[in-house]
């Protein structure tokens, strides 16, 4: 049995739990708006800013006072908009709808939102059933729960029958749930999802791209894994920045080396390219938002034109986006490659900044990888 809203679910819970949840977690949807902050990023000022090297559709304040916003907000806003224009859109939550922003949809379309409770496998089966009768279900929870805890159900109920279900994962990677530690940090989810036949895997880089990716996921005929986070991250794209499933975007042109990144590390890759420019290294930066199906043409073109590849992701280096890039290269055009990512470790508790440094996921670590791969040339 499932509930159409959290209020109905409360009636089934012990009184003490109801009171605790009201105090700790459940907030009115009107409080959803999180003001975007402007924080100056400390980066070296380049001796010459060669604007022509950068994608003209990126924000103009890329390196000074860049706007920040939560990628999960882009998902929540897009889901509401989709609900307005398509009555086949339905949403399912597993007791974390407020945290992942699915509650915004629930507030506007309560009859099309299903609160399943802490039962991800049940949510998956229900979503598959809704898809079977023509609905377009968006099921959402934390990344570690929707993938690892729930993998067999996703495999058999969604991927195997090729159900048109969208798996929307918030609080992914190292940064989003830093203080919660290893149990909540989904560092293996890209690998788990991209190995499944029929599954599309999308990892947008900022709030605006997450908004576009949510719309794009609705257009894909089949299962989609959409990965986003909790923390404020720089908004580097604009409304004019193209987004197409399976088509990577070149954010900076360059001839010496290519940095291929996804998710929040796309911004760090751009910062690294600025610092490398001061060292006389001309780095191409590619936003590889679609891990599957991967854009083989753009990757191989970069390999042929620059001869060196560095990948950067907030995920295990084994089985993640870097592995997907390496698979393309080894089959068609092998070149030296270096991967920046979590190196076969579980997560730890700490602030996002502390963990980014501890797991060597900063722009300086990308620069180090570039220098190492250039020595192999």
What are these regions (language model features)?
Residues 1-227, 232, ...:
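Thiamine diphosphate
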């Amino acid at each position: 049995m499932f509930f159409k809203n959290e209020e109905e679910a409360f009636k089934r819970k012990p009184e003490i739990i109801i009171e605790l949840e009201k105090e700790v977690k459940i907030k009115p949807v009107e409080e959803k708006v999180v003001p975007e902050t402007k924080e100056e990023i400390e980066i070296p000022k380049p001796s010459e800013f060669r604007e022509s090297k950068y994608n003209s559709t990126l924000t103009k304040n890329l390196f000074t006072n860049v706007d920040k916003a939560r990628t999960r907000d882009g998902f929540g806003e897009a889901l509401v908009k989709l609900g307005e224009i398509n009555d086949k859109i339905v949403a399912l939550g597993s007791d974390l709808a407020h945290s992942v922003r699915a509650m915004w949809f629930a507030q506007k379309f309560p009859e099309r939102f299903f609160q399943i409770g802490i039962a991800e496998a049940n949510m998956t089966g229900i979503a598959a059933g809704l898809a079977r009768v023509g609905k377009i279900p968006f099921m959402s929870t934390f990344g570690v729960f929707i993938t690892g805890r729930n993998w067999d159900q996703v495999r058999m109920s969604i991927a195997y029958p090729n159900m048109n279900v969208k798996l929307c994962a918030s609080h992914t990677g190292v940064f989003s749930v830093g203080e919660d530690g290893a149990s909540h940090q989904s560092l293996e989810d890209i690998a788990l999802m991209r190995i499944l036949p029929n599954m599309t895997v999308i990892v947008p880089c900022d709030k605006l791209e997450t908004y576009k990716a949510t719309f794009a996921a609705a257009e894909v005929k089949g299962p989609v894994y959409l990965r986003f986070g909790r923390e404020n991250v720089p908004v580097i794209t604009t409304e004019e920045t193209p987004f197409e499933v399976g088509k990577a975007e070149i954010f900076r042109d360059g001839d010496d080396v290519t940095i291929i990144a996804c998710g929040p590390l796309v911004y760090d890759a751009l910062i690294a390219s600025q610092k490398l420019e001061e060292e006389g290294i001309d780095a191409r930066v590619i936003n590889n938002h679609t891990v599957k199906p991967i854009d083989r043409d753009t990757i191989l073109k970069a390999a042929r034109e620059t001869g060196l590849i560095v990948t950067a992701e907030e995920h295990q280096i084994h089985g993640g986006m870097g592995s997907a890039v390496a698979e393309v290269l080894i089959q068609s055009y092998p070149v030296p490659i270096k991967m920046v990512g979590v190196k076969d470790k579980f997560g730890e508790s700490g602030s996002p900044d502390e963990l980014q440094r501890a797991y060597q996921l900063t722009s300086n670590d990308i620069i180090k990888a570039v220098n190492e791969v250039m020595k192999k040339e």
